[in-house]
From Swiss-Prot:
HAMAP family: GTPase_Obg. Residues 350-428 form the OCT domain. This is GTPase Obg. It is found in: Cytoplasm. It comes from Geobacillus thermodenitrificans (strain NG80-2). Residues 1-158 form the Obg domain. InterPro entries: G_OBG, GTP-bd, GTP-bd_Obg/CgtA, GTP-bd_prot_GTP1/OBG_C_sf, GTP1-OBG_CS, GTP1_OBG_dom, GTP1_OBG_dom_sf, OBG_GTPase. One of its GO terms (cellular component) is cytoplasm. It is an enzyme of class 3 (hydrolase). It holds the Pfam family DUF1967. Mg(2+) binds at S172, T192. GTP binds at residues 165-172, 190-194, 212-215, 282-285, 310-312.
Amino acid sequence: MFVDQVKIYVKGGDGGNGMVAFRREKYVPKGGPAGGDGGKGGDVVFVVDEGLRTLMDFRYQRHFKAPRGENGMSKNQHGKNAEDLLVKVPPGTVVIDADTNEVLADLTEQGQRFVVAKGGRGGRGNTRFATAANPAPEIAENGEPGEERNVILELKLLADVGLVGFPSVGKSTLLSVVSAARPKIAEYHFTTLVPNLGVVETEDGRSFVMADLPGLIEGAHEGVGLGHQFLRHIERTRVIVHVIDMAAVEGRDPYDDYVVINEELKQYNLRLTERPQIVAANKMDMPNAEENLRRFKEKVGEAVPVFPISAATRQGVRELLFAIADLLETTPEFPLHELEEPAVQRVVYKYEKEELPFTITRGSDGAFILSGEKIEKLFKMTDFSREESVRRFARQLRAMGVDDALRERGAKDGDTVRLLDYEFEFVDDWDER
């Protein structure tokens, strides 16, 4: 199973409810309103943690909901703001909105933060609604609902070196002998189904991260075999080590393997061919390997460095690691996308259609159905247990043009109007006093 792409649900905490209260102290005549505001709901925040290397943790928990703010209290005491919910993600995580496919964030650096779902503000207490005309209001708001969304987390592996090659050429064996990683190794294709990471340290103290990536086959750029899941991981590697079975155990020609794999990399992303590549001619301890190596070198020439090794016996591995470390010192990180002129700063202005505050549809039972983010939020923040709050909500709907829109749609006195799970009766001659 690939855990490098996972869909999760996040929701910011709701704001705390405002309070309706009045001062009732012995020596304070006409004390007035004293209801405090609710506290802000917590945000859901992604935080990069270098200690994480996979998205495996999200396999077991896919819903993240921040705590809600504390409700307001009497004596004008405001509710406490809720703590943010911190969700740790590995470096290299790309956050994508599941509904719009918009890339929201690319998290690469230790400690980097991204607020993926904001908490709602606290509802106002009745002190906030006092006016000269109404000095003792019995109105308070419920807390604002927190943002909620479905997001896709995609992990593009942050490895310095990627091992590529056909299945069963010895990539996992090589990683296991040069690092403390213990990948699954067996005599069948696609033993490696997920990338394995290992930290390699050379004898002179240099270190780098090496990734044993799932095996490629012809047609991988079109999704054949492990296809796209493999190629997604290699995009950020700085150096490619091409492991080739020089003994031709599977019956394939080593040079043909080399050509096919490089063509797959080129077809998937042209920029992959710009990365420096080293050939690790593996299984040199087996028959026919020396003759195959000689013919291979004749065909590739001097353009590509070739290191004969045997991962099983560790022959030539030391020299290979030194060559990789030397190459990394002179190889910068590669951009994933096309280069732009560094001196030019561009600002992109996007046209965003103004969202209507509400829409009206008809239900199968003839009821008028109100919907829309703005009107639904207004509804959720209204305390319908208090008459003044209900009247205020009705005034707000009238100001938004809901009454006129319902009349245009043919609503008559006594018709049913539905908003979320609640039903109202349309009153054509409503008196707002």
